A protein has these predicted regions:
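C-terminal ends and interior cores of transmembrane alpha-helices
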Residues: 90-115
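Symmetry-related core transmembrane helices of the 12-TM Major Facilitator Superfamily/SLC fold
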Residues: 121, 183-202
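Juxtamembrane intracellular "pre-TM" segments in multi-pass secondary transporters
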Residues: 2-15, 211-239, 265, 271
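Glycine-rich segments within core transmembrane alpha-helices of 12-TM secondary carriers
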Residues: 65, 152-178, 190-196
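Intracellular juxtamembrane helix-capping segments at the cytosolic ends
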Residues: 133-147
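Central cavity-lining transmembrane alpha-helices of secondary-active solute carriers
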Residues: 59-74
């Protein structure tokens, strides 16, 4: 096959929903990693949480993101990708805005009505609701809106978009932190995903389904999840592998506070996290 033929295959092999979904993924990852790279500093430096409380809250933030993704696919299939993706970006925009507004005066009545740790914990769980819908929608669109001869390339493009957004996020967070203030990092994350709401609303069209496989209910997804965990060997493997990820994610939960407290309080922590 000539280079020209392959180019034509690639040009014609992806439908418009593929490109809309994957471009939106850049900005969703930018928002997520931008917010996550500044979250520990924000909780510890601006909201005066202890190191232990900061670790617990950032761990809750990251843990809920990955846990709720188990059920996000079933919800996305029921709603349809366009509706689910639009809803996800609206939820994320509101969630990131609320995180950056935790210390604002207009939230003072709510802060005073409950322990601050409980309030912040509830707010930090909100982004997980949006991210749990984004992942299955973008991956599902990549599968449905690409022809079979370029589908493998489609997944490569998807992961490239993830990496671009994941690299840009901490860089943007560093700039916002230094020039606008730490709270504004979360406002920029909110604006990024809010813009993607309009991109999806105006340009995304529901990709065609492959086959007539019935949509699973949330209860069926939960049963399947438990069935997967049942084999003891696989469960032991997951427990062991979990230890690796616990250590890995310390770069977002513990490392920022360590650098700020023990190394250099003026260190540009967000830029350090780009190495991830």
């Amino acid at each position: 096959m000539s280079v020209r033929q392959r180019f034509l295959e690639i040009r014609d092999g992806f439908e418009r929903p593929f490109w809309v979904a994957n471009v939106s993924e850049i900005f969703e990852r930018l928002a997520y990693y931008g917010a996550f790279s500044s979250l520990a500093l924000y909780l510890q430096g601006k909201l005066n949480f202890s190191t232990q409380q900061t670790g617990t809250l950032t761990g809750l933030f990251g843990g809920m993101v990955w846990f709720l993704a188990i059920f996000g696919g079933a919800v996305a299939d029921k709603l349809g990708f366009r509706r689910a993706l639009s809803m996800a970006y609206l939820i994320l925009a509101a969630a990131y805005f609320l995180i950056g507004s935790i210390g604002a005066s207009w939230l003072a009545p709510i802060r005073g009505a409950m322990p601050l740790t409980v309030f912040v914990g509830c707010v930090l769980m909100l982004p997980a609701l949006g991210i749990a819908l984004v992942k299955p929608c973008v991956v599902g669109t990549t599968a449905r809106a690409s022809k079979e001869n370029v589908r493998t390339l489609g997944y490569s493009i998807y992961y490239t978009m993830v990496n671009i957004g994941g690299t840009a996020g901490p860089f943007v967070a560093d700039w916002a932190h230094r020039h606008l203030g730490l709270e504004k990092v979360f406002r920029i994350s909110a604006l990024s995903v809010f813009a993607m709401f309009f991109l999806v609303l105006f340009f995304f069209r529901e990709p065609g389904k492959v086959g007539d496989e019935p949509v699973q209910s949330l209860s069926q997804v939960a049963r399947n999840f438990l069935a997967v965990l049942w084999p003891p060997r696989f469960l032991i493997f997951l427990i062991i592998f979990t230890g690796y990820w616990i250590v890995f994610w310390q770069q977002y939960t513990s490392l920022p506070g360590f650098i700020h407290t023990y190394v250099n309080p003026n260190a540009r922590v967000e830029l350090i996290l780009i190495t991830d």
